[in-house]
Curated annotation (Swiss-Prot):
Formation of pseudouridine at positions 38, 39 and 40 in the anticodon stem and loop of transfer RNAs. GO terms for biological process: tRNA pseudouridine synthesis. Substrate binds at Y111. One of its GO terms (molecular function) is tRNA pseudouridine(38-40) synthase activity. It is an enzyme of class 5 (isomerase). Signal peptide: none annotated. Belongs to the tRNA pseudouridine synthase TruA family. This is tRNA pseudouridine synthase A. The active site is at D53. The keyword tRNA processing applies.
């Protein structure tokens, strides 16, 4: 068996998420169906690095799968790219060692979250940016976002009822920039892992801080108290993008 690693991008607006589901369209299912076509009916299991939610997009999702024969890499990439639905693109395919696992091999993830702050909003971006048409103090957001950097227990930023026990994660970079030509705020977070809805809840909190409905030091309070009720609302997933996954060299 040969293990392959692929980097893909997808428009998440017509998917219920990456992970296969019984009664909804998923990225995993579409790719597995394509692999079945390319291997004369064999069932091939795909493993993704990140389980993006409904409506969430990806520039650089990573997955791996095993095939029982050696394939020319560009021919395989081209076949996967052209046989998959139009909202999935295969950027690259490479051979990896048998102990590589897209999810469990140590890595860093980078997410972007795009907020359309235009009044009126851009209707062409309704599936690709979350709209927030209220006044914002960007300086306050830039001050507050720095408090997320470091190793913290992010219980206060995960979804209520999350069952995972260890909620300690490390964020090595967190920033926000304003794109004046589009009237977008773009939040960027890089870390060793993120809890369920963590990125969206961090953005929702930062928007409240920027709108002066929370104090600038609210991030510190949430991290200290570990209380989801102290954080902001969860924005829609349409503004969230899995941008890049970088694996640690052995």
């Amino acid at each position: 068996m040969t293990r392959y690693k692929a980097i893909i991008s997808y428009d998440g607006s017509q998917f219920q998420g990456f992970q296969r589901q019984s009664h909804a369209r998923s990225v995993q299912e579409e790719i597995e169906k394509t692999l079945t076509k390319l291997t004369n009916g064999k069932e091939i299991k795909v493993h993704g690095a990140g389980r993006t939610d409904s409506g969430v997009h990806a520039y650089g999702q990573v997955l791996h799968f095993d095939l029982d024969q050696d394939r020319d890499l560009e021919k395989l990439r081209f076949a996967l790219d052209t046989q998959s639905p139009e909202d999935i693109d295969f950027i690259s395919v490479e051979k990896v060692s048998d102990d590589f696992h897209s999810r469990y091999t140590k890595h860093l993830k980078t997410y972007e979250f795009i907020v359309d702050i235009g009044r009126p909003k851009n209707p062409m971006m309704r599936h690709y940016a979350t709209h927030f048409p209220y006044p914002l103090d960007l300086d306050n957001i830039q001050l507050a976002i720095k408090d997320l950097i470091g190793t913290h227990d992010f219980t206060g930023f995960t979804a209520s009822g999350a069952t995972i026990e260890n909620k300690v994660r490390t964020i090595i970079d967190a920033s926000v920039r304003y794109e004046e030509d589009k009237n977008f705020l773009i939040f960027t977070f890089t870390g060793n892992g993120f809890l369920y809805k963590q990125v969206r809840n961090m953005v929702g909190t930062l928007l409240k801080i920027g709108n002066n409905r929370m104090p600038v030091d609210q991030i510190k309070t949430i991290l200290e108290k570990k209380d989801r009720q102290l954080a902001g609302p969860t924005p829609a997933g349409n503004g969230l993008y899995l941008k890049e996954i970088i694996y640690e060299d052995k």
